[in-house]
């Protein structure tokens, strides 16, 4: 089975090695889809009061209001200073961030949660399956990538969020959509952003890739009861979302750099984007399940 999943280690190694030259990559040139996870990005308006404050390779969003702001995702352990600098560059104060939410409990998206919480004083909102991981700084065997997971700094001030909970700050209201699959605690977020009277439904859809270490099998319901069914339910829920503007934790997964910034050439809005994003993930999941079936003990094939 090891051969099937060596791609995961290669992808992580490539992404991390490409960050070594991050300080030499001028943010003003815009970002490429193959950018390193820590390559600096210009802060940009996405739409209305939603701003991109992440790196070229990993998303972070700031949703703003006069009553305070909500930060969405924390990127890698190295990205905290970039996120804070981008917030300030837009004219906002990190101290005015009143809540922090995130997509899922892996180091490339929760890596700077503790640092950003300390800088802002804001609580981190998390669904129950992610809380122990955030407190420990490491996942357990319920995470498909458990054996290759990188540690993060433990997070102290965590507010438990219902699967369909709402995080509110003044007029802002971000609604959680439980999205287990890539991780147990994965969460998609939806909210409204307006430019004048033109309001759009924003969707920050969690990663939906069926990637694991060499041990985890999505088809093994005895070892992971209900996990595959929950993953499939996630795909159905994301596909059905009211979705005008899609952003994903890895910006390249939703073609973000072709829609905002210096290289933008495609429309920002696409009401079919969430459906197509989920459909692609469903196809990859079915391919993964077929690979697992082909290497199961009953198939006669060697893992």
Say what each PLM segment does:
Residues 23-32, 39-40, 45-48, 69, 76-78, 96, 156-157, 166-168, ...:
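Metallo-beta-lactamase
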